[in-house]
Amino acid sequence: MTHSFLLEPGQWHLKGVWCESNLQPISIEGIVSILWNQPNWFSWNKQLKIFHSEESNFKSHYLFESELTLTYRGYLGLQQSQYTFVLKHNLLGDLEGNGWITPSAIIQRYWVLNDRKRRQGFETLSQETENTYHFCSCLTQGHQMINTIEAILTRTSS
């Protein structure tokens, strides 16, 4: 099975949970769009909404807003299985990263530029079917895990 996520343009629905130490898991949902405008160059946009109620005493150490916006711009050479990207994150600012495309997963890591807190992270997208991926993400600060996201990505359009 070849990858349909990232390697093909399309729109995906993400649904899962946000986890942070000392907090109950919180529902997260959103849209992920992949565009290929030029040969070898892709755009990857994520719009995610965090669902927590005011009564839940939600005291995240990381989330200051209930929406996350991530805009990637990346380069994947012809016949290559590795790519690089830059990323604009509405809470973290400017990031850079790289990724690998393996037969059954897409794995990437990123780091926040000019960050004294040494925040970085990784994401794994494991292919379940042609139109479904299991998504796992972790943000670290120094040697500590700050938060994780675990979700299912389902293709909604090509």
Regions found by a protein language model. Name each.
Residues T2-P9, H13-S158:
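Soluble ligand-binding/transfer domains with enclosed cavities or grooves
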